[in-house]
Curated annotation (Swiss-Prot):
Annotated S-S bridges: none
Similarity comment: family membership: Belongs to the UPF0538 family.
InterPro entries hit by this protein: UPF0538 (IPR018794)
Lineage: Eukaryota, Metazoa, Chordata, Craniata, Vertebrata
Protein name: UPF0538 protein C2orf76 homolog
Amino acid sequence: MAPEEVTITVRLIRSFEHRNFKPVVYHGVNLDQTVKEFIIFLKQDVPLRTSLPPPFRNYKYDTLKIIHQAHKSKTNELVLSLEDDDRLLLKEDSTLKAAGIASETEIAFFCEEDYKNYKANPISSW
């Protein structure tokens, strides 16, 4: 059986406080790969994308979280929902499919330390 390949949007979050993010669309993503393999791919791909400003290409991303799944409701958060971490944060040892990723899913790629700091004090600078 051929691996299932889908299109997903990865939102690169540079700053939670300043709501600084850039979406990048990936086509042909294999859902049978692990989250860890996908993170490694993203860490190799993002610095090579000349369409992204250098601050986004050179940032220390390390965590993935589901923002939105196709045909489901969206949150009111402008950057990323601070709720349901146990369900929406992707665990590195699971496959993308087992983690709930499907076609047209939007996921966030960010620095976990920045996320924890923002979650403890969710104040935007503008």
